[in-house]
């Protein structure tokens, strides 16, 4: 394998991403596809690039990413978390800046379970007076 490769695992909702950073030109490959092909939505692409733009390293690393589970938003968040962890493995002094932007903390919000007697987690059946 590469002599200087940095790894980070990211999670968000039900998605988990494995991120490998290698010194390069800024190429991003997600599940054998480019960032533009994998994420059609511009917002998801922006979320993925946030940690790199913050520390001015967009063109410094090539990224190989595998991501599983969840939807578009969850996967983008998981990748962002993974990139953040990999950047901290590369240079621990970036932690403060990334922490201030809120990228280091794992977003613990998960889907609330459906309750018996309710239509959804909190949505009650319609009330009828008569």
UniProtKB/Swiss-Prot annotation:
One GO CC annotation: cytosolic small ribosomal subunit
Biological process per Gene Ontology, one example term: translation
Secretion signal, residue range per the UniProt entry: none
A Pfam family recorded for this sequence: Ribosomal_S9
InterPro entries: Ribosomal_Su5_D2-typ_SF, Ribosomal_uS9, Ribosomal_uS9_bac/plastid, Ribosomal_uS9_CS, Ribsml_uS5_D2-typ_fold_subgr
Gene3D superfamilies hit by this protein: 3.30.230.10
Transmembrane segments: none
PROSITE patterns, A to Z: RIBOSOMAL_S9
Family: Belongs to the universal ribosomal protein uS9 family.
The name this protein goes by in its record: Small ribosomal subunit protein uS9
Gene behind this protein: rpsI
């Amino acid at each position: 394998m590469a002599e200087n490769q940095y790894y980070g695992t990211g999670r968000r909702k039900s998605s988990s991403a494995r991120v490998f950073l290698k010194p390069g030109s800024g190429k991003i490959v997600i599940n054998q596809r480019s960032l533009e092909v994998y994420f059609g939505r511009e917002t998801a692409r922006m979320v993925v690039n946030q940690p790199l733009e913050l520390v001015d390293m967009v063109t410094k690393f090539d990224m190989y990413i595998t991501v599983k589970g969840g939807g578009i938003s969850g996967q983008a968040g998981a990748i962002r978390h993974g990139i953040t962890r990999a950047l901290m493995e590369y240079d621990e002094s970036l932690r403060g800046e990334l922490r201030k932007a809120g990228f280091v903390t794992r977003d613990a919000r998960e889907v609330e379970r459906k309750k018996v007697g309710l239509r959804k987690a909190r949505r009650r059946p319609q009330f009828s007076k008569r």
